[in-house]
């Protein structure tokens, strides 16, 4: 009646889905592209949200100002200690609102991440009020 999901669950987990596709676990690599958000820069508010403490989930290799490629390479080295057999990664644009920039800048950053040979996809953390139709159309065009 239910599909045979690998973890013995009756739903499809994110990790299980990728494990079936790639034959292994995928690891997210946190990328800090130097974004801010409208609740920090004064457009909506100042100081940010109480739940958005990036220092709590910001690994040492993820530093704004470093290239995306350098952050990916250093992230792979960092995670290889624990996950030696992982060969495929997701570039996770995590800090603040990662669509809070003009589309040409987003295309540049996301394309740099997607061009890395070990990166099979991107994950984008953002606010819904920082995404417009133009950005969604471009993201939908990615294969």
Question: Residue spans of the language-model regions?
Answer:
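Distinct, well-ordered alpha-helical segments
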Residues: 103-111, 132-142
